[in-house]
């Protein structure tokens, strides 16, 4: 973990992004130009104990500058897209369970309506984790990791792949329209390539006409880069922040 940032970050309206995973979390501080000016990485193995989570988060707080906004980025495979014309907020969980009947009862459900897409993004995340962060950061905003990328996918033919340790999310947009958003398990880089080629085949797209972007932490993307580039040479690897 890097040192106290308050010594150099003063009197500027920063925003804070916290990306939480089961093996720890990363904190990014952005300036008014949306540039990362500081980063904190904290190893933490979450076992469901909110007291230890609270202690871990509180240990970070003295190192953080005052921020105009704080967002918790949730990484979870429990998500779905539904057309705006069908969406009813009171039935968000019901929509989610159509695709994910195993959503834990302890999870809290959130929804996000896109301005540039005719769909609503629904996701669920551990309510205990959410409440722990809100207790410490009362103005906290909750966001799924995929939402910014869906919002940015305008007028593009792009396949965005988000890789974690044993799972990947795939977003395919054609002419800025979402054609597919789904979650897949994988074990090897060859599995990732298979899923991408299989998706393009079933949707009857020429894979060479698509930009491909692979997102993940630096170590994870480097492990798969050589194999993926062999079969998908147009792939651009980007570190998630």
Where are these regions (language model features)?
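Short glycine-rich, Thr/Ser-proximal phosphate-binding strand/loop in the N-terminal lobe
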Residues: 22-48, 175-189
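Hydrophobic anchor at the start of a short beta-strand
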Residues: 25, 70, 235
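Active-site neighborhood for divalent-cation/phosphate handling
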Residues: 30, 37-47, 51-151
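N-terminal basic/disordered segments at the start of proteins
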Residues: 1-33
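Accessory, usually C-terminal, subdomains that scaffold auxiliary metal cofactors
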Residues: 179, 183-241
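Loop/turn residues immediately N-terminal
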Residues: 23-26, 77, 166-169
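Small-residue (GG/TT-enriched) beta-loop-alpha framework at ligand/catalytic clefts
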Residues: 14, 29, 111-205
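Short glycine-rich phosphate-binding loop at a beta-alpha junction
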Residues: 17, 65-78, 207-218
